[in-house]
Amino acid sequence: ACNQKTETTLTLSGLDPVKFQTTVNDAQTQLYTLKNKAGMEVCITNFGGRIVSIMVPDKNGVMQDVVLGFDSIADYINIPSDFGASIGRYANRINQGKIVLDGDTIQLPQNNFGHCLHGGPKGWQYQVYSANPIDSTTLELTRISPDGDENFPGNVTAKVLFKLTDDNAI
């Protein structure tokens, strides 16, 4: 019997979109590719709202990937990092993981030497965003963070819009 091979279309940077498909917290991860008329390519995963690769021409016109990242969603999950991610609820460090709101002290998770860094150990960089591909150059990602998410107060809806222009700007 013959085995049929399934052809996989790789991105310009050599990424296999299949390697970015998995389920995290009951949500499906994907790789999205934006391309412009100039040939530039930006690859984004909805896991953490991350830019995974950016292919741009160097001074000699040779396309080069200028992003430090991984080749699969498994690496982003198993080797925790903030590479290319959208950070939230808070970017940077909150001293001792404590905030005061209306006179009440709120203790946030401490994930960085006794401090809360980039929204805590389950920050937005480790969550799956809802994706809305608008056209070949535009992707909108949405993250809904309910009250109490990592002990942060209030409901937050965050939208990240990635737009690749024909003059190679994002």
Put a short name on every predicted segment.
Residues 3-170:
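Surface-exposed acidic/polar loop and edge beta-strand patches at domain peripheries
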